[in-house]
Regions:
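Extended amphipathic coiled-coil helices
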Residues: 2-179
Length: 182
């Protein structure tokens, strides 16, 4: 009975309370990568840089508008809003890997656009600080020294820690909504 109640509460939370949540593709499209984000990636590496970037952008959204919610950190159960539906992620985190790939693409575009525009000598002056930094950003954007699958596993865990749904919070929100409606 308790499992059914928890499942019901989770489904109610996702499908009713979070019915206006942003779709994951819209969330990714809304991310504006800054030069500071790129420098953070170079300084702190792929896992920390990407975690910071995603969490920074998730923080800008109300909890009920976020496109990601984790229901069980130990089992890495994540729900992703896609095409106005909540879908549970698979065991291989295929959808999260696609998200990471899209963010890597955005980092590359920002590196080749904003960074090169601000520091046009970064490709030609091999002795400049910006040339070195450009190389570090490009290296870290694709996972750095850690194998990309291992790096993504750490990245996903960091994101899941941030979007974990506390069962007490779900119950509180649901009861608040029911109280308001009555």
């Amino acid at each position: 009975q308790n499992t059914k109640t928890n499942t019901f509460n989770l489904n109610f939370f996702l499908n009713e309370t979070c019915k206006d949540a942003m779709n994951i593709d819209d969330f990714i499209d809304s991310i504006q990568i800054t030069i500071d984000d790129l420098k953070n990636l170079a300084k702190n590496g792929y896992v920390e840089g990407m975690s910071y970037l995603l969490i920074k952008n998730l923080k800008q959204l109300d909890v009920t508008k976020r496109p990601l919610h984790c229901s069980d950190l130990k089992r890495e159960s994540i729900y992703i809003r896609d095409k106005n539906l909540w879908n549970k992620g698979d065991d291989k985190n295929t959808r999260l890997a696609k998200i990471a790939t899209n963010i890597t693409r955005l980092n590359t575009i920002a590196l080749q656009g904003e960074y090169q525009n601000r520091y046009p000598h970064c490709l030609t002056d091999t002795k400049s600080k910006e040339h070195d930094e450009y190389g570090k950003i490009a290296y870290e954007a694709f996972g750095g020294k850690i194998h990309i699958d291992k790096a993504n596993k750490k990245l996903f865990h960091n994101i899941m820690k941030y979007v974990i749904i506390d069962r007490n919070t779900i119950v509180y929100i649901i009861h608040s909504l029911l109280y308001i409606q009555s």
